Structures are given as structure tokens and as C-alpha cells.
Amino acid sequence: MAQEAGLIPPPPHLSNPRFTLELEFVLSLANPYYISHLAVTYPHLLGISSQSTDNDDPSASSDAKAFAAYLAYLYDYWKRPEYVQFLTHPGATLRALRLLQEESFRKAVIRPQVIEALLGTTTEVDLHVESEEDREKNNEEQAEKGSNGATS
């Protein structure tokens, strides 16, 4: 179990089974559809409550905390140069790991709009939980730009 605690990352060698297993997992996280699959299939791991389960279930909460700690561990070492060289899509992989550090993102990722944003631009993903107030402000700014452009 001490080995599973993950305090020391595995040596970065493709002959190391733990290294290759974790490499395959983090590479999968670069795919927004895989993150969506995790959110839908294993919502308790991301701390997403479902109506069919008891919200006070201590095992679901401990699973979510353990998975969040595991994601933090992965992000901590996969961003190091000796490990990042093995990532086929380092930008997308590290972005996904970084976003998964945020509890609000882990809970919001079950929404299709968040997955669509992940597939789109980076700025949309970084603003994954846009408030209604922000949305209204952006709509007003766009309307002003449109009316200013029409009168010029």
C-alpha cells in the first residue's frame, strides 16, 4: 500500500509497468470524451452527486478525495521534464490534469457544455463555470460592439 500512496513517482522507463500504466492513463485524459466517460460512468470519483445515491455516503466522499489526491500526484510529476517528454500531446494532457485539480471543474465536467469547451478553445475551458452575470455582461458588450460598428 505504501507504493500505492504515490509519494515517489516511478522511474521514467517504458519497461516499468507502473510507469507505462500511469502514462496510458494520463494520455487518456487528453481526450475530453474520456473525461466525460469518467464523469458519467464513475461520478463518485469526481465528487459528482447523483440523485440515485445517498449524498452523505462516506465511501463516495472518500473515493472522490482519494481520486483527487491521485490526480494531484500525477500532475505533480508528469509536468516534470523527465516525464513530459513521454507525452504525445503534452499541452492537452497537462491542461486536463491541471483542470482536474479544481473541484469545481471535476463537478462541472459532467455537463456537455464543458466537454464542448474542452474540445474548443483554451479560454473557454479556463472559464468553464461562467456565471449568469458574466454571460449577460458579455452579451451586452457584444451588442454594444455590434451597434457601434453599424453606426460607423
From Swiss-Prot:
- Per the UniProt record, which residue ranges are transmembrane? none
Does this entry carry the keyword Transcription?
A: yes
Q: Is GTP-binding tagged as a keyword?
A: no
Task: Choose any GO biological process term that the UniProt entry carries and state it.
Answer: regulation of DNA-templated transcription
Among Pfam families, the record links this protein to: Med31 (PF05669)
| Ranges of compositional bias, category Basic and acidic residues | 126-144
Keywords (alphabetical) are: Activator, Nucleus, Transcription, Transcription regulation
A GO molecular function assigned to this protein is: transcription coregulator activity
PANTHER family this protein is in? MEDIATOR OF RNA POLYMERASE II TRANSCRIPTION SUBUNIT 31
This chain's function reads:
Component of the Mediator complex, a coactivator involved in the regulated transcription of nearly all RNA polymerase II-dependent genes. Mediator functions as a bridge to convey information from gene-specific regulatory proteins to the basal RNA polymerase II transcription machinery. Mediator is recruited to promoters by direct interactions with regulatory proteins and serves as a scaffold for the assembly of a functional preinitiation complex with RNA polymerase II and the general transcription factors.
Output this protein's name.
Mediator of RNA polymerase II transcription subunit 31
- Protein source organism: Coccidioides immitis (strain RS) (Valley fever fungus)
